[in-house]
Amino acid sequence: MTTLQERVAAHFAESIRAKQEAEKILVEPTVQAAELMLQCLMNDGKILACGNGGSAADAQHFAAEMTGRFEKERMELAAVALTTDTSALTAIGNDYGFDHVFSKQVRALGRAGDVLVGISTSGNSANVIEAVKAAHERDMHVIALTGRDGGKIAAMLKDTDVLLNVPHPRTARIQENHILLIHAMCDCIDSVLLEGM
């Protein structure tokens, strides 16, 4: 029987391996995603972010890093988590269905050149799929953070979008990589804005 200590150690080991595997395939796409967001922000655009459950928390975490700061003081950057307005979420969910809680907000707030960050560990979250459709209707770019095989969202993306897919079967490991990717993108943005890299 495995001890609790062994279980915890196994989480560390698996998380490290998952990050090492992700590094092999996601460094360049992460830079592309950061550059896409920078281009949007430099053109007075905004970034909208959405997801469900832990991915909703990641969307909020990302927006907070943008509007506040990541690790260094800098100007505020326009980012909105579509997961925080309970009145909008419940009204849209009640009147149109849960699949549309993000897409209605994307249509209301999104403009051509803006960026949608859609987060779904399965790549199959119906409301994130609808948000991607709405973003494309608005001529927005999409950065999709997904897991496993990328799901339906990966298949929807255009050449001008960026897929950050973590090909791991466990949701916890995918989520851990997603927050690492979010932090890496924030760092890239800050490096360009503050250091001219």
From Swiss-Prot:
EC numbers for this chain: 5.3.1.28
Pathway assigned in UniProt: Carbohydrate biosynthesis; D-glycero-D-manno-heptose 7-phosphate biosynthesis; D-glycero-alpha-D-manno-heptose 7-phosphate and D-glycero-beta-D-manno-heptose 7-phosphate from sedoheptulose 7-phosphate: step 1/1
GO molecular function, one term: zinc ion binding
Substrates-to-products reaction catalysed: 2 D-sedoheptulose 7-phosphate = D-glycero-alpha-D-manno-heptose 7-phosphate + D-glycero-beta-D-manno-heptose 7-phosphate
GO biological process: carbohydrate metabolic process; D-glycero-D-manno-heptose 7-phosphate biosynthetic process
Localization terms from the record: Cytoplasm
InterPro entries hit by this protein: GmhA/DiaA (IPR035461), Phosphoheptose_Isoase (IPR004515), SIS_dom (IPR001347), SIS_dom_sf (IPR046348), SIS_GmhA/DiaA_subfam (IPR050099)
Residue sites binding substrate per the record: N52, G53, G54, E65, N94, D95, S120, T121, S122, S125, Q175
Alphabetical list of SUPFAM superfamilies matching this protein: SIS domain
Superkingdom of the organism of origin: Bacteria
Gene3D superfamilies: Glucose-6-phosphate isomerase like protein, domain 1
Similarity remark: Belongs to the SIS family. GmhA subfamily.
Protein name as catalogued: Phosphoheptose isomerase
Cellular component terms per the entry's GO annotation: cytoplasm
Cofactor: Zn(2+)
Gene: gmhA
Residues annotated as domain SIS: 37-197
Protein function: Catalyzes the isomerization of sedoheptulose 7-phosphate in D-glycero-D-manno-heptose 7-phosphate.
EC primary class: isomerase
Key words of the record: Carbohydrate metabolism, Cytoplasm, Isomerase, Metal-binding, Zinc
PROSITE patterns associated with the record: SIS (PS51464)
Binding residues annotated for Zn(2+), in chain numbering: H61, E65, Q175, H183
Subunit structure: Homotetramer.
